[in-house]
Regions:
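"…together with the soluble PPM/PP2C metallo-phosphatase catalytic core" -> "…together
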Residues: 2-219
Length: 219
């Protein structure tokens, strides 16, 4: 088991602090360009509120991943190319984040927002091993393995479903962030303690994202 040494603690602190710094900057930019949530039946705000906080979280995650993480990882022998591992996820996230930012300003039609999510899902399916390619029936059941075509459709459908589920609950301050932190923390625990082989980079990537989201909370 690879320990979370002091270098990795600094990585997480860096993600947290960077998110704190970027959040007010993104808030000012959002107000200037009109990326705001207008009052409606789903929201409790009575005046337009900046709606691009996710951009601060994403930028904090990306900067931490590309600049701080390699400094920590270089001190340990790890048989994985981290950039090859995470770059497609970042590109997919960039597509979704950009689509969301444009939607915050211009209120895109649903078909265009869906197109952005589908493109991101295809990138992740094509260039990573994050795929819905099997399902283990609990309590001693068999492992069901899916063919490439079904794997493709299930993976894309899963990413679309999760993304839209998050969008649907985005009506109360802190709700999406809280749900995301709980979900990500569960994933981190499972990936570090309960997989047949520890996926350390997956765990650390998830925890970096958690730190970025937590940094968004104080502001």
């Amino acid at each position: 088991m690879i320990p979370f040494t002091i270098e990795y603690i600094f990585v997480l602190i860096g993600a947290f602090l960077l998110s704190i710094i970027l959040t007010p900057i993104i808030r000012v930019i959002s107000l200037k360009v009109g990326a705001v949530d207008k009052p409606n039946a789903r929201r409790i705000n009575k005046v337009p509120m900046p709606s691009s906080g996710g951009l601060a979280i994403f930028l904090s995650f990306v900067v931490t991943t590309f600049f701080f993480m390699p400094m920590a990882a270089s001190r340990h022998f790890i048989e994985v190319s981290y950039f090859h591992y995470i770059l497609p996820v970042i590109i997919g996230g960039l597509v979704v984040t950009t689509t969301g930012f444009i939607d915050d300003i211009f209120e895109l039609r649903p078909r265009y927002k869906m197109l952005g999510i589908i493109i991101a899902a295809i990138i992740i399916w094509k260039f990573t091993h994050f795929r819905f390619d099997s399902f283990k029936i609990p309590i001693g059941g068999p492992l069901l393995e899916f063919g490439p075509i079904l794997t493709f459709f299930l993976t894309v459908l899963w990413i679309i479903s999760i993304t839209n589920a998050i969008n649907l609950i985005d009506g109360l301050d802190g709700l999406v962030s809280g749900v995301s932190i709980i979900s990500l923390a569960t994933m981190a625990v499972v990936s570090y303690f309960f997989l047949p082989k520890i996926d350390f980079f997956l765990t650390l990537t998830i925890v970096i994202l958690i730190a970025s989201i937590v940094g968004f909370f104080p502001l």
